A protein has these predicted regions:
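N-terminal capping segment at the start of a domain
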Residues: 2-28, 129-130, 318, 378-379
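A non-catalytic alpha/beta surface segment that caps or lines the substrate-entry region
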Residues: 22-70, 74-76, 80
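Short, conserved micro-motifs enriched in small and acidic residues
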Residues: 28, 135-146, 228-236, 383-390
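Active-site metal-coordination/substrate-binding segment of hydrolases
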Residues: 67-161, 169, 391
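Midchain, well-structured core segments that form catalytic/ion-binding scaffolds
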Residues: 112, 126-139, 171-295, 299, ...
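Phosphate-handling active-site elements
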Residues: 153-166, 247-254, 405
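Metal-dependent amide/peptide-bond hydrolase catalytic core
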Residues: 235-405
Length: 405
């Protein structure tokens, strides 16, 4: 079975994760895909495939004869999708021989356009896969799962000798909880790759340092007709807080290694308001400065409006895995050579986000990230090509070959 055929099947399984439930997995939907994957792994000869109580799928492929004592290499992808644009099941749409121009996404009224996504012109002649425009596609990260499965199927012909291989599919990556119950010992790999990137040929081992900030504002609500020097409008103090952050340090205005503050939720009235941010920066020192700047603004506003008016809670999420991967750069070298031998230019880029691999690297499992061929994740314009997925499979297989050469 081709990788894209698997993808078309997987995306129809509804698997959004949720930050609201506080459970692991965060949604029971994810077990639907997990059980399907366990069955497929067993059909592919992965006899010990199973899913645990937290919805982690594990499986192991024995080494080729003579390679039993070699280091263990793993491949990981995640089963959940974002919850945005995911209030009903996905309907994938295939467009053969895409012309590189505007493409109407079903009857949604949305148009996938090179004006918004300039790389689309480079996909001319390929077979494009999208949703119908009413949901995400779910290639993030079901494309990674499909590609790993296809790699396993290809290995069954025994043309690529290899040591012990370890496979895992995780829940809740999109809410930053993918590694929360990941059993590194059970997985068993010495090194691994996540397949959770974008363009085929992408190789990533630098990611954001990340934190979440919740800012609570407590006001004093007095009748507006008699509130002179008394009222403290929590909503206005919240606006003041946000105005004191650097106006250009937003996702829209930054790229590459530039960090940002992202205000993703705002709620409030006179009595109470809440701002929720994510804080991101590749550089650890700059990351600390960002957190301290929010603490300083909190201090200033409490001095102005009264103690307890502003309350800041910052929660660390993950760190830049570069400091771990720097000790095993052969993983990046293998991936780079693999891309070149598959006639795809290696694209080494910083991750403007995080992957399970970032946290797993700090749990003792060095784990850079590889591109799957997908684009425009987390929204209705998400897309991928059949050809890009095929290349990602070839690169993965070549990495295995080089790792055990």
């Amino acid at each position: 079975m081709k990788a894209y055929e698997r993808l078309l099947s997987y995306v129809k399984v509804f698997t959004p994760s949720s930050e609201e439930t506080g459970t692991s997995p965060s949604t029971q939907y994810q077990f639907d895909l997990a059980r399907l994957l366990v069955q497929e792994l067993k059909e592919l000869g992965v006899k010990d495939a199973d899913v645990d109580e937290h919805c982690y799928v594990y499986g192991h492929i024995p080494a080729t004869r003579g390679y039993e004592s070699r280091q263990k290499l793993g491949f990981i992808a995640h089963m959940d999708t974002v919850s945005d644009f995911c209030d009903h099941p996905v309907t994938p749409v295939i467009t053969p021989n895409y012309d590189g121009k505007d493409l109407a996404l079903g009857t949604s009224g949305r148009v996938l356009s090179p004006k918004m996504f300039p790389h689309l012109s480079t996909l001319k002649g390929r077979t494009l896969i999208t949703s119908d425009g009413t949901t995400i596609l779910g290639a993030d990260d079901k494309a990674g799962i499909a590609e790993i499965m296809t790699m396993i199927e290809s290995l069954n012909d025994n043309t690529i000798p290899h040591g012990p291989l370890c496979i895992a599919f995780t829940p809740d990556e999109e809410i930053g909880m993918g590694p929360a119950h990941f059993d590194v010992k059970k997985f068993g790999a010495d090194f691994a790759y996540t397949l959770d990137g974008d363009t085929e040929g992408e190789i990533q081992y630098e990611n954001f340092n990340a934190a979440r900030a919740v800012v609570e504002f407590t006001g004093v609500n007095v009748h507006p007709g008699s509130s002179k020097n008394t009222m403290v409008n929590a909503a206005l103090v919240a606006m003041e807080f946000n105005s004191m952050l650097p106006s250009a340090d937003t996702p829209r205005d930054t790229e590459d290694y530039e960090g940002f503050f992202h205000l993703y939720s705002i709620k409030g009235d006179v009595s109470h308001a809440t701002l929720e941010y994510i804080i991101r920066d590749h550089d650890a020192a700059s990351f600390d400065v960002r957190k301290k700047s929010m603490e300083h603004i909190t201090k200033i506003l409490n001095e102005k409006w009264g103690k307890g008016t502003v309350s800041l809670t910052i929660t660390e999420q993950y760190r830049n895995m570069k400091e771990i991967i720097a000790t095993c750069m052969e993983l990046i070298e293998h991936a780079t050579v693999a891309c070149k031998e598959c006639n795809i230019p290696p694209l080494i880029t910083p991750i403007r986000g995080g992957t399970d691999g970032a946290q797993l690297s700090f749990m003792g499992l060095p784990c850079p990230n590889l591109g799957t061929g997908g684009h425009a994740y987390h929204g209705p314009y998400e897309h991928i090509t059949v050809e890009g997925m095929n290349i990602a499979v070839e690169v993965g297989l070549k990495i295995i070959e080089l790792f055990y050469k």
